[in-house]
């Protein structure tokens, strides 16, 4: 029998199969070499069973079937009488996968790509796929300009037919663009055209967007930008004939040549609109109106199409089709646009669903909706819902999509997918602040209390100059119409001298309540009443304080410290505007507020205060990682009825929340102390004690940039910026004629300037802000403070 097998093997030398030429009935099937794969599993994958009459073709199919499982490197089928002997060599099992040297590609991305190719821990290793994986990864590096990159798969055998798989990367450096040539341009210079490219052969220091590192994707984007540049200026026949990318022998340099044909400029003769316009032909005609002699403009054509889709989308036509076919007349150099419109079906909203709101109740999200269930789908209302959810500040991001309801021709579901952020915190700790010294803090705050959207806070702070406690509650939807109700109780013991202010102590407590009324999507009004008790003591003879005390009927002595108690009832009113795209770390939109406060009859003081705050975000690039931020804060207050506004209600500037680079509250008028005879105390006056003023103006210009060396996972919780701050505080009641030798504190032109960098982090304990700023313009008595940081909220 052994001789028979040997003879058959020699006759069929080179084949992986040894069997007789005639068919036979299989009596038994035996496997040799199985380790990980069970016999039963192997038998299930075979087309041959015990008792079958098999032919040569059946046995060949058996080999192919076993190979197809991916479990075996080698398969042989032998015949021993009527028995089949299947000899296999199993592929090794992958015990681990590691990566080395990959700086441009993350491990997670590599694992996903390997799994897509069937390479994962615990699975059999198909060595034939490794070369294609190596080549695919190298092709990726070539596409980003790293032509010296190599990828090598290293397989290390382990006991029990296992292996370790390690991908070793040698990335090298990106090839630098040496020259970009545009051939065939006559209407525009190469410099003008290349100015719109991201890839450049010469990058000026001020151009933060340009790059000399070659990337295939960026080149494709630049070619599209070149095409759009010509099409937007009437060159309807513009074509890019060819693009050559040449590599230097050392693979370190790139030469790019772009061959173009400009053609002639064409004018728009008119727009011919046809098709199903769902009864909105008049509106569509207005959107497609062109001026006589107007140049053909590709961007305008795209804008027309988008505006038509938006128009139809507002009225429930969720999936309109707009096709534009330009008819080019080369003789007259004119273009007629033939636009065919199919509005499609009008869709109604069956359901609005929310996904990802594990904490926030559905009702909290649903009340922000402007799209109603059962009504036709309105694209504007759907987008407004997304904007309003983002504006709540409860979510890191919000996405929305419309899903067609299967089996219906005119129904959709609107699905909002949210990712919640941590809106609450409990903390007890000890910290240090540049403005407050040693600080003890305990607090519980929840901006989305139990998922209801209510804001509940209990906070306390103890530092060198302040002991503060507060309990507050705000219900943003006190009524179903969006009327908000807020209330606050507070206690504050403030030692001004320790805060670099003039000497006095104020122990105050009070409460207030506020109602807010929405006017429209972006505007709201508020009104409120409040009570505050102020207990002033340890007031040293000082011009601003003595001036106030005399206005309220007190006659303080210049030789001793004064005290005074005041009970005030206040009415507040305000207007607010908000169209920011997000509740935290906005990237677009504006926010502004105008607020006023006035004392009511029965108060010991008679004064009013007005403040205006605004901030506007202007994104520079499409993905909004580069943003310009402008901020303004204005304030003015004064007394009436012969009384002055209390000095402790003065405006201050300087510090991390105002003009950075200056010490907190240090900008503006300084304390003028008096001797016992009423003259100016020259020894104490001219120091650094700030008293503030009844008028203030602060402005800031900031460039928000991507945070370097930070992964995308943390990009949404970090923000980096460079800034320039300016601010001034002045006293309109200052009498310069009385104190001619002192600075004129009534001047608004004593503006301080600073410039620096800032880093903000939305930490689990609250916002953490670091800044480093250098004063550019300062005055005598100003204190600078280059490095500043702030944790959480300030009062």
Curated annotation (Swiss-Prot):
Belongs to the BamA family. The lineage of its organism: Bacteria, Pseudomonadati, Pseudomonadota, Gammaproteobacteria, Enterobacterales. GO terms for cellular component: Bam protein complex. This is Outer membrane protein assembly factor BamA. Residues 24-91, 92-172, 175-263, 266-344, 347-421 form the POTRA domain. Its main location: membrane. Residues 1-20 form the signal peptide. It comes from Edwardsiella ictaluri (strain 93-146). Part of the outer membrane protein assembly complex, which is involved in assembly and insertion of beta-barrel proteins into the outer membrane. Constitutes, with BamD, the core component of the assembly machinery. InterPro entries: Bac_surfAg_D15 (IPR000184), BamA/TamA_POTRA (IPR010827), D15-like (IPR039910), OM_assembly_BamA (IPR023707), POTRA (IPR034746). Keywords: Cell outer membrane, Membrane, Repeat, Signal, Transmembrane, Transmembrane beta strand. The keyword Cytoplasm does not apply. It is found in: Cell outer membrane. Part of the Bam complex, which is composed of the outer membrane protein BamA, and four lipoproteins BamB, BamC, BamD and BamE. GO terms for biological process: Gram-negative-bacterium-type cell outer membrane assembly; protein insertion into membrane.
């Amino acid at each position: 029998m052994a001789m028979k097998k040997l003879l058959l093997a020699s006759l069929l030398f080179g084949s992986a199969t040894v069997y007789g030429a005639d068919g036979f009935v299989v009596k038994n099937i035996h496997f040799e070499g199985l380790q990980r794969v069970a016999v039963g599993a192997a038998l299930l994958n075979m087309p041959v069973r015990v008792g079958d009459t098999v032919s040569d073709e059946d046995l060949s199919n058996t080999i192919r079937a076993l190979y197809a499982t991916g479990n075996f490197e080698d398969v042989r089928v032998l015949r021993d009488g009527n028995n089949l002997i299947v000899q296999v060599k199993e592929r090794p099992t992958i015990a681990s996968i590691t990566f080395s040297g990959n700086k441009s590609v993350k491990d997670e991305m590599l694992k996903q790509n390997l799994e897509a190719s069937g390479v994962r821990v615990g699975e059999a290793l198909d060595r034939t796929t490794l070369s294609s994986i190596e080549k695919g990864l190298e092709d990726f590096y070539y596409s980003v300009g790293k032509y010296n990159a190599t990828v090598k798969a290293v397989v290390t055998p382990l006991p029990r037919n296992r292996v370790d798989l390690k991908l070793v990367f040698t990335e090298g450096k990106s090839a630098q663009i040496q020259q970009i040539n545009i051939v065939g341009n006559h209407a525009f210079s190469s410099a003008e055209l290349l100015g719109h490219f991201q890839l450049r052969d010469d990058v000026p220091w001020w151009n933060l967007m340009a790059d000399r590192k070659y990337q295939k994707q960026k080149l494709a984007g630049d070619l599209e930008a070149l095409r759009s540049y010509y099409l937007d200026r009437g060159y309807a026949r513009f074509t890019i004939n060819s693009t050559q990318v040449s590599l230097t022998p050392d693979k370190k340099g790139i030469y790019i040549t772009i061959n173009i044909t400009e053609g002639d400029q064409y004018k728009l003769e008119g727009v011919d609109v046809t098709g199903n316009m769902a009864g909105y032909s008049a509106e569509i005609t207005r959107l497609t109106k062109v001026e006589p002699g107007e140049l053909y403009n590709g961007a305008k054509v795209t804008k027309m199409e988008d505006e038509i889709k938006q128009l139809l989308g507002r009225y429930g036509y969720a999936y309109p089709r707009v096709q534009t076919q330009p008819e080019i007349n080369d003789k007259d150099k004119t273009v007629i646009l033939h636009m065919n419109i199919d509005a499609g079906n009008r869709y109604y909203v069956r359901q609005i669903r929310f996904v990802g709101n594990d904490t926030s109740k559905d009702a909290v999200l649903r009340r922000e909706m402007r799209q109603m269930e059962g009504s036709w789908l309105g694209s504007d209302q759907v987008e407004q819902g997304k904007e309003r959810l983002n504006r709540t500040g409860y979510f890191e991001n919000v996405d929305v999509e419309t899903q067609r309801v299967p089996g219906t021709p005119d129904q959709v579901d609107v699905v909002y997918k949210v990712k919640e952020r941590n809106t609450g915190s409990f903390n007890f700790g000890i910290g240090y602040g540049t403005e407050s010294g040693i600080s003890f803090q305990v607090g519980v705050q929840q901006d989305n209390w139990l998922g209801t959207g209510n804001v509940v806070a209990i906070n306390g702070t103890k530092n060198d100059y302040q002991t503060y406690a507060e309990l507050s509650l705000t219900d943003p939807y006190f009524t179903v119409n969006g009327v908000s109700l807020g209330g606050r109780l507070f206690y504050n013991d403030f030692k001004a001298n320790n805060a670099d202010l003039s000497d006095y102590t104020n122990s105050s407590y009070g409460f207030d309540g506020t109602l807010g009324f929405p006017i429209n999507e972006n505007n709201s009004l508020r009104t409120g009443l409040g009570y505050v008790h102020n207990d002033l003591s340890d007031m040293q003879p000082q011009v601003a304080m003595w001036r106030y005390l005399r206005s309220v009927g007190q006659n303080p002595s210049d030789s001793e410290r004064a005290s005074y108690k005041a009970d005030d009832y206040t009415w507040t009113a305000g207007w607010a505007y908000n169209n920011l795209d997000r509740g935290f770390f906005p990237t677009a939109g504006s926010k502004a507020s105008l607020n006023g406060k006035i004392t009511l009859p029965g108060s010991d003081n008679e004064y009013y205060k007005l403040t205006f705050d605004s901030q506007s975000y202007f994104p520079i690039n499409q993905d909004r990682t580069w943003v310009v931020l402008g901020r303004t804060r204005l304030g003015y207050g004064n007394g009436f009825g012969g009384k002055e506004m209390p000095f402790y209600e003065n405006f201050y500037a300087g510090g991390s929340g105002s003009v950075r680079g200056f010490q907190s509250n240090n900008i503006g008028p300084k304390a003028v102390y008096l001797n016992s005879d009423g003259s100016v105390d020259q020894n104490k006056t001219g120091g650094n004690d700030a008293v503030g003023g009844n008028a203030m103006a602060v402005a800031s210009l900031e460039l928000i940039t991507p945070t370097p060396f930070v992964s995308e996972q943390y990009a949404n919780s970090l923000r980096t910026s460079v800034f320039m701050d300016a601010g001034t505080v002045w006293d309109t009641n200052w009498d310069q004629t009385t104190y001619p030798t002192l600075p004129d504190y009534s001047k608004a032109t004593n503006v301080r300037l600073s410039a620096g960098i800032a880093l903000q982090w939305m930490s689990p304990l609250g916002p953490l802000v670091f800044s480093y700023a250098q004063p550019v313009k300062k005055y005598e008595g100003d204190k600078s403070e280059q490095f500043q940081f702030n944790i959480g909220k300030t009062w």
